[in-house]
Amino acid sequence: MAAIKEESDYDSSRSSLTAPDSRRSWISDIGSSSSVSARSFGGDTPASSCRYKPHKANQAEWEAIRRLRAGAGRVGLEHFRLVRRLGSGDLGNVYLCRLREPWSSSSMTTTAGGCLYAMKVVDKDALAFRKKLRRAEVERDILRTLDHPFLPTLYADFEASHYACLVMEFCPGGDLHVARQRQPGRRFTVSSTRFYVAETVLALEYLHMMGVVYRDLKPENVLVRGDGHIMLSDFDLSLKCDVVPKLLRPARSAAAGGKPPLPPPSSCVPPTIQPVLSCIFRGVHKCHHAKECAGGGAAAGNNGDGDGNDEEAETETAEPEVVVVEPVAARSKSFVGTHEYLAPEVISGQGHGSAVDWWTLGVFMYEMLYGRTPFKGESNEKTLINIIKQPVTFPRLAGAAAAGEWEEMKTAQDLMLQLLAKNPKKRLGSTMGSAEVKRHPFFKGVNWALVRSVRPPEVPAPPAPAPKKVMTMSKKERQEPYNYRPENHFDYF
C-alpha cells in the first residue's frame, strides 16, 4: 500500500516495501511522528466501551468475552491460546486463537473446543521505528466504533509487553481473492458478483456515514464469514473525517444536464473517533425548487402565478429527497492504496476524498467479473500510466451469452464505467455517495434492507477441530512471534 506525507494523515515518512504473502506490491508510509510514543496504544478496552452491540449481542463470542471480563476483570494475552497464523501484513500478523479454560466453556458455544477469534498482533516498537505506529492506532480507534453486519467486531484490545493485540471475529471462508480462484474460469458469475458488491456497498455506506474513507478495498480485504456473508478488513489506511447530514434531492436533472447541490466541505480530523452521526436531524427543511422549463411556452408564461397545479405536478414527479451523510467533500493528498486499485486523483496528487472508494469498488467489481484488474500493466509504473491515460475496456467472455448473462453483463459494464470515471467529480457516488450507486439498474431487484436474509452464493464448511498436539514456544519465538510460522498448535507462554 502506498502513502505520501500529508498532515491530516499523520504521516512523517516515505517508505516503500512489499508485504509478505501478497500477490501485489504495496507501498505505504502513513506513519506516526517521532513524538508518538510506542507506549501510547493503551491497555485493555474498558468494559464500558465493550457494550453489547445490536448486531452481535447474541453471539457466543461476545458472551465468552463478557464472562471473561466479568470474572477476571480484564482481557489479556494470557487468556488466549494461539492456534495458527492466518496471515501477515504490513503492520503485523493475524492468528487464529481461542480462549483458554475455564473461559472457553460456554453454553452458547457450538464450535468444538470453544469460540474462535482472529487476533492481530503488532510490534509497537517496530512500528514506532518505522514511523507507522499511528496507523495501528487509527485502525484500533476505527474498529472500536464499528457496529455493522458486514464490518469487523472488535471484542477486545490490549497490550502484552511491546505488542498490541486486537481480538476480532474469525472468518472461516477466507477472502474473495482466494474464493475467485475456485470459480470456473477464475471469475464470479454476474449474480454472485451482484451479491458481494451489494454487501460491500452497504459496508462502505456505513463507513462513510461514520466519516471513514476506507481507501483499501480489494478482494484480499473482503473476508467471508461462516454464514457466507462478507466482512471488510484492514483499516490502517483509512481516513477519518467529519460528516454533516444533508438532505438532497437526486438530480432529476441527470437527463437535463444539471447537478444537485453539493454538501458543505468536510474537514479531516485526528482519529479520536467520535461518531458524528445523529439520528435526529434538526433544522433540516425540505427545499421546494421552482419548476424549470426549457424553451419558454405556457408554463414559462405563468411566471409562477398559476393556481398551484404546476406545483402539485412537480411534487408528484420530483425525485424524493435523500439524506446524505457521507464525507463527499473530504480531501486528502496521501498516496495510499494498492497500485492496481489507485484512483487517478491519488496518483496525480490533486487530493482525494470518499470518491476513491467508489473507484476501487469499480476495480473490485471488474476483477470479480473478469478475473483481473482493468489497468494492470507489465510493471507498477505501467499500471499507474494506464490508470491515468487508458480507457476502460471489457474483454469478451466465452460462454457469457450461452449462460444468459449477456444483458446483465452490459448493465454491469455500465455501472463499472460510471464508477471508473477518471474525473472524480463525474464519478458515480461522488456527489450523493451510496444513494447514487444503489439506484443503478445493476442492483434492480436488490432489497437493500433484507440483503442479510439472502442466501450467499457459497457457504464455507465449518472449521476443522484444532489438532490435539500442543507446541510450546521458545523464548525467542515469544519475543518475535511475527517471525514464527506455527505448524499446528502452540502455547504463547
Curated annotation (Swiss-Prot):
Residues 444-493 form the AGC-kinase C-terminal domain. Residues 474-493 have a biased composition (Basic and acidic residues). One of its GO terms (biological process) is cotyledon development. It catalyses: L-seryl-[protein] + ATP = O-phospho-L-seryl-[protein] + ADP + H(+); L-threonyl-[protein] + ATP = O-phospho-L-threonyl-[protein] + ADP + H(+). Residues 307-319 have a biased composition (Acidic residues). It is an enzyme of class 2 (transferase). Residues 295-306 have a biased composition (Gly residues). The keyword Kinase applies. Belongs to the protein kinase superfamily. Ser/Thr protein kinase family. Signal peptide: none annotated. ATP binds at L86, G87, S88, G89, D90, L91, G92, N93, V94, K120. Residues 80-443 form the Protein kinase domain. GO terms for cellular component: cytoplasm; nucleus; plasma membrane. This is Protein kinase PINOID 2. CDD domains: STKc_phototropin_like. The active site is at D216. Residues 1-53, 295-320, 458-493 are annotated as: Disordered. Its EC number is 2.7.11.1. It comes from the Eukaryota. Residues 27-44 have a biased composition (Low complexity). Keywords: ATP-binding, Auxin signaling pathway, Developmental protein, Kinase, Nucleotide-binding, Serine/threonine-protein kinase, Transferase. One of its GO terms (molecular function) is ATP binding. SUPFAM superfamilies: Protein kinase-like (PK-like) (SSF56112). Serine/threonine-protein kinase involved in the regulation of auxin signaling. SMART domains: S_TKc. InterPro entries: Kinase-like_dom_sf, Prot_kinase_dom, Ser/Thr_kinase_AS.
